[in-house]
Amino acid sequence: MDDPKLSKSSLVLAALVSAGAHANPIGFDTDKRGALPAGWTAGVTGRGTPKWAVEADGTAPSAPNVLKQSGAGTFPWCVMKGASVEDGFVEVRFKSISGAEDQAGGVVWRWKDGDNYYVARANALENNVSLYYTEKGSRKTIKYVDAPVPGNVWHRLRVEFQGRRIKVLLDGKSYIELEDSHIQGPGALGVWTKADSVTAFDDFHYGSSKAPQK
């Protein structure tokens, strides 16, 4: 049975974040190909040599460019340097292209640094959606749920977060809704992969539930 507290809070959160959304999704279409998007930074939690770059992709939801990770590392990430959100949402379109060990696409929020943040991801090899927190470089599982994630297909991954409440949606369907308090306070937002996942991202979108200061 659904928790009535969580169901009610998710309705309130949806109303709040719609009012504080970033005006337009970030489609990487004005960024230089072969380089990171302007205002973004990349790295890895753990070890490895991730390769993040803007590339052309004829299948992109908002053509012509995508942000693509084609290297390998424990947990590669790429985050915006100019945004800091405590409560709100983060959303992205992603396509899992290949990977022998993993085929993951995810989003991060309340990102303090490369060792401390929340992450939600969908996995085309495992056909599931998972929620984690990372503290001091160690990733810990909060919950995972089976979900259809066919590879080489564009999906929409969205996370709504307000205080302790977290809701994870894939392609418009809610798969995880719970409370957790491991990572608190404002932080950056971005995208994430795992291991040898080759993943493309497009239409990155975020919003804050806090009203802008006048």
At which residue positions do the language-model features occur?
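Bacterial N-terminal signal peptides that target proteins for export
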Residues: 2-11
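Extracellular carbohydrate-recognition regions
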Residues: 23-44, 213-214
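Extracellular glycan-recognition surfaces and repeat-rich motifs
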Residues: 35-65, 73-74
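Secretory/extracellular carbohydrate-interaction modules
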Residues: 69-130
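Short, aromatic/His-centered strand-loop micro-motif at the edge of beta-sheets
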Residues: 135-156
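Short, solvent-exposed beta-strand-to-loop segments that form ligand-recognition rims
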Residues: 169-188
